[in-house]
Amino acid sequence: MTNSNSITPVMQQYVTLKQQYKEYLLFYRLGDFYELFFDDAIKTSKILNIVLTKKGNVPMCGVPFHSSETYLNKLVKLGYKIAICEQLETSEEARKRGYKSLVKRDVVRIVTPGTIVEDSLLEAKESNYLACIVMIKDSCAIAWLELSTGLFCYHMTYISKLDSDLLRIGPKELLVADDLLEIEAVYSIIKKYRFSITQYSSSFFDENRAYNTLCNVYGVSTLKGLGDLKGVEISVCGSLLEYVIATQKGSLPKLGFPKAYVQSDFMFIDAAALRNLELFSTQSGELEGSLIASIDFTVTASGGRLLKRCLSAPLASADAINRRLSVVEFFVNNQNLYKSVRQVLRGIADIERILTRVKIARCSPKDLYSLKLTLEKTCELVELLCKFNIDIISEFCLRLGRYEDLICILNNSLLQNSVSSVKDGGFINPECDAQLSEYIYIQECSNQLIQELRDRYRNITNIQSLKILYNNILGYYVEVSSNHLIDDKNFIHRQSLANNVRYTTTELKELESKIISAKDASISLEIKIFGQLCSDVIKYADKITITAHTIAEIDMLTSFAELAVQYSYSKPIIDDSYEFNIKKGKHPVVERNGKFIANDINLSSEQRVHLITGPNMAGKSTFLRQNALIGILAHIGSFVPAEYAHIGVIDKVFSRVGASDNIVCGYSTFMVEMIETAAVINQATERSFVILDEIGRGTGTYDGLSIAWSVIEQIHNVNKSRAIFATHYHELSKLDKYLKHIKCFCMKVEEWDGKVVFLHEIIPGASDKSYGIHVAKLAGFPQSVVNRAEYLMDKLKTNEDLLT
């Protein structure tokens, strides 16, 4: 950076601010542009593909203020953090302090991937979490906050479950201590993710410091009356808040006290299962082809976010699940109603996020107008639902609430074409304020008022050629020819020219002042009225929050009804038994691709482990995933793709299916397989649901068979989980002879005229063939290679020497 003694006052101001925000790209406001200088300019110009110029020896680039959010969006998505420096006064205000006074500037907020609240920077149906992990000795806690909605949770966890926690939460930014990343077990997990990482020294996470932050934020002297936070939980929640306060420069919305995420209330889906089952994205990272893409019929942003939260943490209480199922069933049985409800929902804005922007004084007139329209739509929802005298629906009506008074205030004050920024005015109804009406009248009628005054002066002076003109030096002035001098003390001489004489009057000066200042005055008054409207909205904040949550829930449940009706899903029976009985079940994603063969499964207590043999390509993996997905769908309160489903509550879902066959963190494929299998046998309970595919295939035959055999015994005898185990080891089919709760099944195959047909049906019994050579033929192996493989297989069957 250039020597500070050789640069202009403006650049000195920039350098001083940049020293305070070294880790951020500094967007420095100069007039209608945000400018970047030095290394920031070089880096940003490359990222944004904008022109890099120089002023002297100083590299610089800039983006227009009015379109800055487009550029911010790109930078934030790439994980950059930006300090926004604004002008805190006008140049006129600066000159009042002295002719050469520099306009005051300061950083007013810091934009980071986990702390954004602007709609233009957020994905509508994606939560935008900032997370924090703190470890003290053997205790580990994680907290996460979505600033745009106020959702704030914390959870005690273990390093072994950290991968699952991070995958479930999906933060955009992670706050950690430097020394935490020095722990290999933690670093190996975190480095797999693409979120932005913000590091501080361990002193930032000090418990006493965090305690004081929490007390200051919630305005209390002790935390005892607010919750059961202790030790590392205090550290993780307080540190997270301190970081948010720093990024928002003190402009923090009113947040509820952090809520404990109680794992026992929710189904635990381990990281391998979240990935292998493709709940949120395919193995290639695409949304299309994932479970959520197949079941998301929500029509509001908040409903979409709720669906994703529910899918990442399904319910684990039969009562809670059945409450949702009852609502879905009600809507399925009243299709005209749910279609009408969904039509109303389509006109609803994201008031959860709008409310946060109102609280931190970062909302726009358009936001308030959208809020007004949504509250009107809420009244329509209540009218639709209150016709049904059913408890679960009446509860929705109560929680939706009514807002006649607030709607009236907003209706009377806001113009329909409300704009996205307050800086230019034009969004407040002039009829709501007499002073504003006068300002607007002056602006709209300035030409007419000048002409009326001109006509009056012509009558007074008897000079019909008299004109009222304007220039930047004199402002408005009266002009007559030199032959028609005005002899009236009310007309003050200003200027004499060769052919004309110019005058002014007190009345003309006052009118000029009104015309020139009316625009600024009207904008200032509109901003003041807008501030009062925001204060009026904040009075309803708690009620609006409940309404927003209710809208999201109604949207999600009516989307489940749409899913059930469109694809003929059935209502599952959910209870506290250990049943898993599915008739004519289908894979909710794969069935959309065309004809799909439905299959049954009954993992009752008498046959809680199913061992499935059969060739590759026959559909074993699809069948395994299908049943895990049916179980998960049932636990979020959705109907399921089956004719019948009876499912006892599942506490955990584990999956070791081939989709993880890649090298992660330097581990071999086989090591990854063993790690995922170890998680199953170490954590699964008798309420868990386990799917295991081809355990042991990544090593030698005897090693693999021995591992697979012992894993099945462990799950059968110790874990006692409901499990489906697919294998190519036909020897394992002997296990049903001495493990009484195992039943063998295989994939149905027909052979005809030398051809093999995979029927994708599950039937009782064990397969005695792998059909591997046939699959190789289907894959396009040359016939010579296929023939050679068949010849060698025949020799192996008769124990002949392959080299003879």
Swiss-Prot record:
InterPro entries: DNA_mismatch_repair_MutS, DNA_mismatch_repair_MutS-lik_N, DNA_mismatch_repair_MutS/MSH, DNA_mismatch_repair_MutS_C, DNA_mismatch_repair_MutS_clamp, DNA_mismatch_repair_MutS_core, DNA_mismatch_repair_MutS_N, DNA_mismatch_repair_MutS_sf. It comes from the Bacteria. The keyword DNA damage applies. GO terms for molecular function: ATP binding; ATP-dependent DNA damage sensor activity; damaged DNA binding; mismatched DNA binding. CDD domains: ABC_MutS1. One of its GO terms (biological process) is mismatch repair. Gene3D superfamilies: 1.10.1420.10, DNA repair protein MutS, domain I (3.40.1170.10), MutS, connector domain (3.30.420.110), P-loop containing nucleotide triphosphate hydrolases (3.40.50.300). Pfam families: MutS_I, MutS_II, MutS_III, MutS_IV, MutS_V. ATP binds at residues 614-621. Keywords: ATP-binding, DNA damage, DNA repair, DNA-binding, Nucleotide-binding. Belongs to the DNA mismatch repair MutS family. HAMAP family: MutS. This protein is involved in the repair of mismatches in DNA. It is possible that it carries out the mismatch recognition step. This protein has a weak ATPase activity. This is DNA mismatch repair protein MutS. The gene is mutS.
